[in-house]
């Protein structure tokens, strides 16, 4: 899920890039490591295959409705952390960016998106979130 090259730390979202509590925790741990390493000058976010991120893991949320509110709040904390991160964050949007994935792109300092494929979408209102 991560790779360091010189002064750049890359966070790569696996598969469709859906966010569940484990992915959120892993992302926070990577950000903690970057903040602790003064040699890191930038963070790159990237997806895999045709997806940057499909957003929240809706299957997980449907199976765990009791933690819905807490989980959504924790995703907002992650987006806020990217907004205020001490080194530049660059989103390399290789494909679809939905929901939280799209919000992380918006919270980045810079974003580059392929022009030939991928959708950028915030579907929360359409699905009643």
Predicted regions and their residues:
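Glycine- (often His-adjacent) and acidic-residue-rich active-site loop
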Residues: 39, 46-81
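Short beta-strand/loop segments at the ligand-binding rim of alpha/beta enzyme cores
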Residues: 84-91
